[in-house]
A protein has these predicted regions:
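Non-heme di-metal
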Residues: 2-171
Length: 171
């Protein structure tokens, strides 16, 4: 029988719960995710220095790392439907602003890094906004109000820029 797996921002069933394999999957996911971001940053530097080919290779490798991370995340049962993903994202953002960044800020202050503590708190405030945004979007999905509203709105096509004024988008 599968056990319930609880990671920050996701609660799903997984056959790996409580095993070293689960820890390995979490480490692999984190490592590939970090590598992707790192290579994206490196690409930006290479491009600014005029090394277009090196920048392109960093970006290509970053895309490879993204796919590796996705593979491990799927094994950890981390991808659901849009409503589940919004709920998981909101939970993760909540943890970040209520616990993680505040704890980091307190530690930074205690260790004599007040400027870093202020940055942690600033990012925590941004994470709070992210949680609110995800919860609002989740409400819209659950209320079936993504493409229709009870009052008149301005809708803009994200592809061609067409403007529609009304209670529903032209999709």
């Amino acid at each position: 029988m599968k056990k319930k797996k609880e990671m920050k921002g996701m609660t799903k069933q997984t056959k790996y719960a409580g095993t070293q394999t689960e820890k390995n999957l979490e480490t692999a996911f984190a490592g590939e995710s970090q590598a992707r971001n790192k290579y994206t940053y490196f690409a930006s530097v290479a491009k600014k220095q005029g090394f277009e080919q090196i920048a392109a290779l960093f970006l290509k490798t970053a895309d490879n790392e993204k796919e590796h991370a996705k593979m491990w995340f799927k094994e950890l049962a981390g991808i659901g439907d849009t409503a589940e993903n919004l709920a998981a994202a909101a939970e993760g953002e909540n943890y970040e602003w209520t616990d993680m960044y505040e704890g980091f800020a307190k530690t930074a202050e205690a260790e004599g890094f007040p400027e870093l503590a202020a940055k942690f708190r600033l990012v925590g405030e941004i994470e709070k906004h992210h949680e609110e945004r995800y919860r609002a979007l989740l409400h819209n999905v659950e209320a079936k109000e993504v493409f229709a509203k009870s009052d008149v709105k301005v809708w803009e096509c994200r592809n061609c820029g067409h403007i529609e004024i009304g209670r529903a988008s032209c999709r």
